[in-house]
């Protein structure tokens, strides 16, 4: 791989047995810190799910160590070049699950999962009739970008997906089901759950959106918008052939791909908005959040009560 930038961002996961996640997490954090990596890694008895950044040399050492650990034999790293770190700190945390589905009866992807489709096969499958494409991510991820024709489940988090499927059975019955997510980890369990629910033709995008966007053959075609990522980059491009903006400004509905968090820390909702509207609406999604005494935009910009009142008056006048 020809390297043109000094840093890399690694994205990876593996379902494998880790006997003592707490002990492993502590040791792994010390190892990552010794390499001066930054990122967020989740560890559970069922495996590991991580994304981290570092220099080319640091990430090479990390991948070498992981590949030399028999527990992670065959692990696949998705690699992005970067100009600098994509995280501020390094966290390695033990968790009950790698992805939070909270099923009554958990799914082991080694025992049951949907059929893996490589990018070219997934591309062809999306164009077939009687196919339903389900986005297995959160609503704010979908709003920034998704495959053409994909269904956006009316959910706020991944663990709500099984209930949504049960409530919308008529949309899926008798259809070929395609599922996708950012890197593939959510679909390993979700597609397996669909198979267990009795759906016969279930496939998943192998390696997720990130792999699809890098594939030299499909080049991200049939993807609109950008892909939401859980680091300081926030969004990465997918479609190498054309860039269609699907995100809409929370306040005006105009095309927008810039995410901010609502300035009220008790809300923290992710909203798409321009820099102009961020200033106009005090980076807040509602009147209640604008007048919150903890509004971070107001505090950060040291706005006076008079300035806040003037901003609120301007918003009211524009309605």
Curated annotation (Swiss-Prot):
GO MF annotation list: oxidoreductase activity, acting on paired donors, with incorporation or reduction of molecular oxygen
SMART domains, sorted: RHOD (SM00450)
EC numbers: 1.14.-.-
GO terms under biological process: tRNA modification
Residue span, Rhodanese domain: 127-221
The keyword Oxidoreductase belongs to this UniProt entry's keyword annotation: yes
Catalytic activity reported: uridine(34) in tRNA + AH2 + O2 = 5-hydroxyuridine(34) in tRNA + A + H2O
Keywords: Oxidoreductase, tRNA processing
Active site residues of this protein: 181 (cysteine persulfide intermediate)
SUPFAM superfamilies: Rhodanese/Cell cycle control phosphatase (SSF52821)
InterPro entries, A to Z: Rhodanese-like_dom, Rhodanese-like_dom_sf, Rhodanese_C, TrhO, TRHO_N
Database matches in Pfam families: Rhodanese (PF00581), Rhodanese_C (PF12368), UPF0176_N (PF17773)
Enzyme class: oxidoreductase
Family according to the record: Belongs to the TrhO family.
The protein's role, per its UniProt record: Catalyzes oxygen-dependent 5-hydroxyuridine (ho5U) modification at position 34 in tRNAs.
Protein known as: tRNA uridine(34) hydroxylase
Species of the source: Bacillus cereus (strain ATCC 10987 / NRS 248)
Name of the gene this protein is made from: trhO
């Amino acid at each position: 791989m020809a390297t043109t930038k000094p840093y890399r961002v690694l994205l990876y996961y593996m379902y494998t047995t880790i006997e003592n996640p707490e002990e492993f997490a502590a040791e792994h954090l010390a190892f990552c810190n010794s390499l001066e990596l930054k990122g967020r890694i989740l560890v559970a008895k069922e495996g590991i799910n991580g994304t981290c950044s570092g220099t080319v040399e640091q990430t090479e050492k990390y991948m070498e160590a992981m590949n030399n650990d028999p527990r992670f034999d065959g692990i696949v790293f998705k690699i992005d070049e970067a100009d600098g770190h994509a995280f501020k700190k390094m966290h390695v945390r033990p968790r009950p699950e790698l992805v939070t589905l909270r099923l009554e009866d958990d799914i082991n992807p080694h025992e049951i999962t949907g059929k893996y489709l490589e990018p070219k096969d997934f591309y062809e499958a999306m164009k077939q009739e009687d196919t339903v494409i389900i986005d297995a991510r959160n609503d704010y991820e979908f709003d920034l970008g998704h495959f053409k024709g994909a269904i956006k489940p009316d959910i706020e988090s991944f663990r709500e997906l099984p209930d949504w499927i049960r409530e919308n059975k008529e949309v899926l019955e008798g259809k070929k089901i395609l599922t996708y997510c950012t890197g593939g980890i959510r679909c390993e369990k979700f597609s397996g759950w669909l198979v267990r629910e009795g759906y016969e033709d279930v496939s998943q995008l192998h390696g997720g959106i990130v792999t699809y966007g890098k594939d030299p053959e499909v080049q991200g075609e049939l993807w609109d918008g950008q892909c939401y990522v859980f680091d300081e980059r926030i969004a990465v491009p997918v479609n190498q052939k054309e860039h269609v903006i699907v995100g809409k400004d929370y306040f005006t509905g105009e095309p927008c791909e810039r995410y901010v968090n609502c300035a009220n820390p008790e809300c923290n909702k992710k909203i798409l908005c321009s820099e102009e509207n961020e200033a106009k609406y005090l980076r807040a999604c509602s009147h209640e959040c604008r007048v919150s005494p903890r509004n971070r935009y107001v505090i950060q910009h040291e706005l006076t009560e008079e300035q806040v009142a003037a901003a609120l008056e301007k918003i009211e006048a524009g309605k």
